């Protein structure tokens, strides 16, 4: 983009993409003409707890049981930390099971009607391993930003035209 002398552009992002778009806009407000964001995810602690620890578990209890089944009962107080431990384990089988559980949980809850092609992705070791490890790594490290970074800096982007689209049944990014 910089090689093509594009000075500013429109951002579009959904879920994690909305997080990245907002962070980019805060760090580079003069380069953003507008934003269209769907499924807003600010990566706040309570959003992570809602989805990975409690909350969404009440809506999808059967899928949540599959998700937590790879974590021993005595290690479930902080599921993100426990998953991080298993996702970074040297034990490849343990790591693969944790990655499949993490990925299946997210893909099973990200659509109103369960999609077989999504569930199939969670059974692909290379996809699940990369998806779960990258996502969990960012979450365990607070996406490498201070708490509530986006909300604390929203004044920087208040003049950027922004459209927000939010789904009624969005469980991942309520």
Can you describe what each PLM-predicted range is?
Residues 146, 171-174:
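Conserved alpha/beta-hydrolase "acid-adjacent" motif
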Residues 9, 13-15, 167:
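Conserved alpha/beta-hydrolase "nucleophile elbow" surrounding the catalytic nucleophile
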Residues 157-158, 164-166:
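Short beta-strand/loop motif that positions the catalytic acidic residue
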Residues 18-29, 35:
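Short glycine-enriched nucleophile-adjacent loop
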Residues 30-83:
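A catalytic-pocket lid/entrance helix-loop region that shapes and gates access to the active site
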Residues 1-10:
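Conserved acidic catalytic loop of the alpha/beta-hydrolase fold
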Residues 137-154:
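Active-site nucleophile elbow and catalytic-triad environment of alpha/beta-hydrolase enzymes
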């Amino acid at each position: 983009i910089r090689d093509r002398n594009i000075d500013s552009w429109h951002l579009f992002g959904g879920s994690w993409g909305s997080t990245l778009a907002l962070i980019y806009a805060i760090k580079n407000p003069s380069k953003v003409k507008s934003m269209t964001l769907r499924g807003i995810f600010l990566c706040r602690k309570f959003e992570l707890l809602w989805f990975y620890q409690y909350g969404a578990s009440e809506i999808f209890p059967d899928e949540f049981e599959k998700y937590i089944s790879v974590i021993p009962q005595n290690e479930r107080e902080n599921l993100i930390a426990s998953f991080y431990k298993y996702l970074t384990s040297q034990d490849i089988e343990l790591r693969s099971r944790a990655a499949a559980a993490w990925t299946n949980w997210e893909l099973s809850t990200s659509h109103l009607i369960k999609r077989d092609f999504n569930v199939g992705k969670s059974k692909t070791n290379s996809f699940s391993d990369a998806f779960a490890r990258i996502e969990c790594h960012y979450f365990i490290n607070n996406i490498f930003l201070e708490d509530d970074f986006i909300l604390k800096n929203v004044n920087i982007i208040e003049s950027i035209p922004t459209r927000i689209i939010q789904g009624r049944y969005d469980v991942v990014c309520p």
